[in-house]
Amino acid sequence: MNHDFQALALESRGMGELLPTKKFWEPDDSTKDGQKGIFLGDDEWRETAWGASHHSMSQPIMVQRRSGQGFHGNSEVNAILSPRSESGGLGVSMVEYVLSSSPADKLDSRFRKGNFGTRDAETDGPEKGDQKGKASPFEEDQNRDLKQGDDDDSKINGRGLPNGMDADCKDFNRTPGSRQASPTEVVERLGPNTNPSEGLGPLPNPTANKPLVEEFSNPETQNLDAMEQVGLESLQFDYPGNQVPMDSSGATVGLFDYNSQQQLFQRTNALTVQQLTAAQQQQYALAAAQQPHIAGVFSAGLAPAAFVPNPYIISAAPPGTDPYTAAGLAAAATLAGPAVVPPQYYGVPWGVYPANLFQQQAAAAANNTASQQAASQAQPGQQQVLRAGAGQRPLTPNQGQQGQQAESLAAAAAANPTLAFGQGLATGMPGYQVLAPTAYYDQTGALVVGPGARTGLGAPVRLMAPTPVLISSAAAQAAAAAAAGGTASSLTGSTNGLFRPIGTQPPQQQQQQPSTNLQSNSFYGSSSLTNSSQSSSLFSHGPGQPGSTSLGFGSGNSLGAAIGSALSGFGSSVGSSASSSATRRESLSTSSDLYKRSSSSLAPIGQPFYNSLGFSSSPSPIGMPLPSQTPGHSLTPPPSLSSHGSSSSLHLGGLTNGSGRYISAAPGAEAKYRSASSTSSLFSSSSQLFPPSRLRYNRSDIMPSGRSRLLEDFRNNRFPNLQLRDLIGHIVEFSQDQHGSRFIQQKLERATPAERQMVFNEILQAAYQLMTDVFGNYVIQKFFEFGSLDQKLALATRIRGHVLPLALQMYGCRVIQKALESISSDQQVISEMVKELDGHVLKCVKDQNGNHVVQKCIECVQPQSLQFIIDAFKGQVFVLSTHPYGCRVIQRILEHCTAEQTLPILEELHQHTEQLVQDQYGNYVIQHVLEHGRPEDKSKIVSEIRGKVLALSQHKFASNVVEKCVTHASRAERALLIDEVCCQNDGPHSALYTMMKDQYANYVVQKMIDMAEPAQRKIIMHKIRPHITTLRKYTYGKHILAKLEKYYLKNSPDLGPIGGPPNGML
């Protein structure tokens, strides 16, 4: 009964969370937020309570507090203080309120150290909350969470939430973005706190406003204020609290809301040990061991949160069990309510649960072995924290540290080495071992293999966020026992193992095993490895090993982790080949290059495995398919992981970005292992999960922007002396980047032939893609400009067959133009390219991009090869001449084609001269004939203009043609045009006067003054002189006066007796 009563107290603590320590006075201006009720939400208090739940360190930086969450979790901002909103929890709340511990023993010290009225920095009000960003992309709107909390969840079970807990209790909340009590709240409300560092509220801490990384830089102590240092004690009781959690490097969305769980990813050295009294510790252990139904308390996230933030353990459920079903619940040891599986990322089999979902086997085994394991810890006085920074090797839990997995299962796996494959071998595959989907990647990029929990082959895979995965000591020992029997490389025996104890880390060495016992399984093939081939590494450096069959990518890269026939525990070995260390080559640089692979080699990793098991790897929305679903409901990676528009799915053997490049499973994981450790590291130079491309940069290093790390560093000016040879494997990617394309263009101009050939080899396979790329097309053009003849012809052959689509494409048309300029027209490939336009001439001519290609063809190709263009223009000259793009092509024909070809074009032009001169585009064609045409063609046009000079000169477009007529006509024709203007009358005034005032015709008059013979110029002057005073009133008339002044000031004798005006003024 004592345990039951305590379980109720642990489960429901909404009011007790705040009532003992909440301040009810308000020193600030009460009218700041308007008139509100007496008892308001916690946004109304000047600062939060002294409770540890509101401590600045209990809540991650840049995480918004849930607006309006007051004394109980789902209250509105102006709600009156009242018992629980649901009647079901009223009695619990009353008991909790009565039995809540008095804070009197802590208030004094807080008042002594607190500085009331001055701590604005600690305020978590809406002003502060609005300025914070969201730590997770999955964080939902705060107000929407408040409004939908009761409506959406109250129908799942009797208590209102799928977890069997009140909506008021925020310790276990599957809604991202909501506030969750930190483990320190659990401790403080359970009873007296033995650690004075826990439970302290806003204090005048000099480090309070610094980043959390600085605050917890010391793993032993927590800087509370300037007066005292409080040390952290290790656990003192028989509870399996000696787990080593790993910090997640990204914003994690797991089973719990991590907004206020500081252990997971906000600290460099997470304070994972929450201090409890000895009595409470013993009660936890006894409750877990003796009463299975108390596991519901642990599943609610209360007790385990005080010890382990959120690791994952392998459940004992049968293969393919869906945790949403009753079978999954039974396997997870009678959780309190259905187990909620949150939105997750990476492929993990069903049955891998957070460690907080306690299991009976783990509880019993942990209770029995905790005291025995305590003596073997590497550092007894300090909880070890695994957080691999940049350049560090990934740490793993040591052999002495035990987890909350089901040790009994691991022992069973050790006793029966073929447990992991038992069902698979029994279902029609005797003697052919296929790895069940028990491997996945954790947040460090390491390959994690389930300890025999997934015994079937067809178990569905779920998506999991990059959160820690724990390894139990029993699993390690079981694997060691299995390896001792010669069945597989063990966790302790193999120096290349994925998981090895922290305390025992021998130097990296090649481990040879008898070939008779080394029956190895890779993810994509099964092969019997000999002594010359120790194991199939996940991404092997060397060429293909004898006897290995790689089903994924060719050229001998055995793309599978060499998992032994007995997968008991974590008996896996990812080692490099002993026979190929001297012949190391660039990873995936030849046959599996980005654009060289055929469609067959582009099969997604793991696709043969899933398809053979009736589980399709085709893309589908992110979800968690049930075991009963048919193929086609596979899992897909987050969209950001596909940078080349690929539709490849997320697969077991490795993450791909859609183009065959391997990427780490965890966001940010590539930064941790850039500089790899040389001892016992998966990411070392001799045994690497992701081998580097050029000593440092992995093809797996895909930044969040979708660019590789090399390109990202180059864009950030981290490589001022980058050379073309440094871009091997990245030429295409750089060509498609604005800055990278410019860099390659500049280098190609001064590159050696060998360097140009290296670049050319990479871009040739992606030539068409680069031709249509906004930046890549310039690299192709550079090769047409600076490449050798063979390179130019090779690129031209890539254009063949695609001339029309390229000609109509914005960037492809530029490539074709450059090719036509750079390659001699007598080359056969050029003639073939031009011939592809036959039948599509008019379409190209009227296209904004294609017309440039046709123009370039006319300019660069021999006219005899262009007769099909002339034939296409027959009967279309007037239409094309009045077209914005067609008029340009007509002009090119008039310039470059033979007389025989241009004659029919000119005949059609002369038939429509009067319309063309007044057209906004056709007038350019007529002007072009006047400038470059034959004299007879010019005379025809001038004869069309004569008699209409006055009218056409006042036209916006025709006035330009009249000017050209005056300029390019013969002397006799020009005299006739000028006489027409001078002698013609327009009403009471001469035509000259009208033209001088017109906005367009005045330019014709100016041109006549310039081009006229001296005798005619004198006549024009006499005609203009009477109108000088009037012309001053008109804007355009002033242009004529300026022209007259020019000639008068010359005092030219050509003016005769005219001289200046009598008054000396113009």
UniProtKB/Swiss-Prot annotation:
Modified residues annotated as Phosphoserine in this record: 67, 82, 102, 136, 178, 182, 587, 592, 684, 700
Region of interest (Interaction with SNAPIN), residue spans: 1-260
Pfam families in UniProt: PUF
Region entry Guanine-nucleotide binding in RNA target, spans: 959-963
Record field: compositional bias (Low complexity): 505-514, 526-540, 630-650
Comp. bias intervals (Polar residues): 515-525
Cellular compartments per GO CC: cytoplasm; cytoplasmic stress granule; cytosol; glutamatergic synapse; neuronal cell body; nuclear membrane; perinuclear region of cytoplasm; postsynapse
GO molecular function: lncRNA binding; miRNA binding; mRNA 3'-UTR binding; pumilio-response element binding; RNA binding
Family matches, as PROSITE patterns: PUM, PUM_HD
Region: Uracil-nucleotide binding in RNA target, residue numbers: 777-781, 923-927, 1002-1006
Start and end residues of each stretch annotated as Adenine-nucleotide binding in RNA target: 741-745, 813-817, 887-891
Cited SUPFAM superfamilies: ARM repeat (SSF48371)
Protein's name in the database: Pumilio homolog 2
Source species of the chain: Homo sapiens
Lineage of source species: Eukaryota, Metazoa, Chordata, Craniata, Vertebrata
UniProt gene name: PUM2
